[in-house]
Amino acid sequence: MAEPSFARLFLLFFSFLLIFATYSWVFGPDSGFLFGTRVRKTLGSNRQVHVDHSLEKPHHPLDPLTVREINRVRTILSNHDPGFGSGSATIHSMALDEPEKSRVVQWKKGNKLLSRRAAVVAYWGGQTHEITVDLDSGRVVSDVINRTSGYPILTLNDVFAASQVPLKSLEFNRSIEARGVKFSDLACITPFAGWFGSEEEGRRVIRVQCFTLQGTTNYFMRPLEGLYVTVDLDKLEVIKIIDKGPIPIPKASGTEYRFGVQNKPVHMDRINPISMEQPDGPSFRVEDGHLVKWANWVFHVKADQRAGMIISQATVRDSETGEPRSVMYKGFPSELFVPYMDPEEGWYYKGYMDAGELGLGPTAMPLVPLNDCPRNSYYIDGVFASPDGKPIVQPNMICLFERYAGDISWRHSEILFANADIRESRPKVTLVARMATSVGNYDYIFDWEFQTDGLIRVTVAASGMLMVKGTPYDNVDDLGDREDDAGPLISENVIGVVHDHFITFHLDMDIDGPMNNSLVKVHLEKQRVPTGKSPRKSYLKVKKYIAKTEKDAQIKLSLYDPYEFHIVNPNRKSRVGNPAGYRIVPGGNAASLLDHDDPPQIRGAFTNNQIWVTPYNRSEQYAGGVLIYQSQGDDTLQVWSDRDRSIENKDIVLWYTLGFHHVPCQEDYPVMPTVAASFELKPANFFESNPILGSAPFFEKDLPVCRPFASS
């Protein structure tokens, strides 16, 4: 057999293409870039200025590392260990080592900036190093080997290098030829390894699955089913190849998703472009790149390699006094768990931990103005470190915009009194902070939405394409009693594999301060009415219980045993004596149905409950643990919570998992409609009355003149 050199060149090109699509690599001043960073072009906003990241300085204790700081960390690390200079040491993450929470809370604008440190996770010599770099002194203050199970977050270099390894194997190349696939059409991706026992312990491994690009960009719909490769990530060599023989490759026809190459007739009337106009400009402002001020809200927002986007120090102005009052110190998606429901070879290991295994930041593509974000949006870049420690930029990774969709925040008309003509209504205008990440076939859109009544709504929307399985069958009638357990047939030779999505959020609630918060479980209990006392037979009574320890706060939601869950500050009372609080309001949700001793569920044990409360611990940030790749579940939220520490009247963290089961159908093929799930953080006796009374209605005179009618 001839050496498939063209295929290797193609995969190399394909890998670099993905790198350039993901990262904003830059090479010189002529391109408008400097020091490996990008000068952002203004998109979607007339008031947004260009940002030269090479000149940025931190202004707030929680501001992310700047380009200058990342370059300085790289220099310090090179002096600390020759591995960083030679390239044998790989940086898997570099982020701000946030100052102690108490110091951040006390800091005020105008004060001297707190000490800046960088937290680095690096890998070399088969060991994971957690390194702290003091930027003020220019030295490494700690270098500790993490000996827990698991490995650090993958780099895209890991992923792209592993995808090329199978081409070194003669057996693999023969399998590709046997399937009639040209090497020039080959596209290989790297589903993560999971953890399934001793065979894979002691070395970093990854799976490789291949598809064909022939006839479509949507290669996810054309899997080379039955061919599975396991690769040693450190040695970059094939460990195992499983070839079950050729299975029919699904057709390319009808799978292309790019708008410019669609050739099918569209049987719907065209929708005219829609835009929300703001003649006076947006109502929010962004100070120093990260501090957002809008209506009665102030919060800090930044991009993060692992979490994607972090909201910090969210405060809302009191509607009676104007006092800024703290609501949440820090909120972010801590982990995404996506287990697939196919126990067969080639699929059983697919139980992704997207945040901890690959990161939501590096996979966040630039948001598309007018389609991802509306007019008058403000864009924020992400600044991260590459595996060799050089700064890189994810342009337009986060957008901020005001949303008005014709919704009503409050209304009332009075009709009971003669001569009364009372019609009061307030439009619902909200502020949204958004980011989107493309993790393989799935895209996730994260929205943090702030309302003037003090409510925060968090929404996660899933989009993109399914991960499908090839099958010999092209009609359900051919299956007979052999219906595939993995999922339904959604197109010829295509099984939509059943799977779950679980997103666990870290919500460090600070209701009127970081200390003295408690969880109150508000139980709705059915009461029987004594015979003869009333025509009614039953009613609901509210009973409140304060959670004393962590196990009191391990909560499974139930429609038939309803609770509300309030985080309160018992030391801050309203004028009628109620403790100030916020409650978490779950939306539609789903629970994991996997056995607790199933390896994916051991690692994803943070989904065993929908709500948890733990005492604040700055080392407990990630629900699946710091090192989650091939981890064994020994450092999860479940493990921490089982210590059963006290949580009453303390600085506490609320954890909430939203989820949904996904049984695919034909409408999910070849691309999926966006599906969203959400929850709310809602004031509960926090204000003396509804702040919405202070919002103003819209008037025609304040708006631009537009054509107000549609054709009849």
From Swiss-Prot:
The keyword RNA-binding does not apply. Cu cation binds at H499, H501, H662. One of its GO terms (cellular component) is apoplast. Its EC number is 1.4.3.21. Pathway: Amine and polyamine degradation; putrescine degradation. Mostly expressed in roots, stems and flowers, and, at lower levels, in leaves and cotyledons. GO terms for molecular function: aliphatic amine oxidase activity; copper ion binding; primary methylamine oxidase activity; quinone binding. Substrate binds at residues 352-363, 439-444. Its cofactor is Cu cation; Zn(2+); L-topaquinone; Mn(2+). The modification 2',4',5'-topaquinone is found at Y442. Keywords: Abscisic acid signaling pathway, Apoplast, Copper, Disulfide bond, Glycoprotein, Metal-binding, Oxidoreductase, Secreted, Signal, TPQ. Binds 1 copper ion per subunit. Can also use zinc ion as cofactor. Contains 1 topaquinone per subunit. Residues 1-24 form the signal peptide. It catalyses: a primary methyl amine + O2 + H2O = an aldehyde + H2O2 + NH4(+). Disulfide bonds join C188-C210, C373-C399. Induction: Induced transiently by auxin (IAA). Strongly induced by salicylic acid (SA), and, to a lower extent, by jasmonic acid (MeJA) and flagellin 22 (fgl22). Triggered by abcisic acid (ABA). Induced during wounding, dehydration recovery, and treatment with putrescine (Put). The active site is at D354, Y442. Mn(2+) binds at D508, M509, D510, D651, I652. Glycans are attached at N146, N173, N516, N617. Homodimer. Copper amine oxidase that can use putrescine and spermidine as substrates. Required for abscisic acid- (ABA) and polyamine- (PA) and H(2)O(2)-dependent induced nitric oxide (NO) biosynthesis. Involved in ABA signal transduction and in responses to osmotic stress. This is Amine oxidase [copper-containing] gamma 1. The gene is CuAOgamma1.
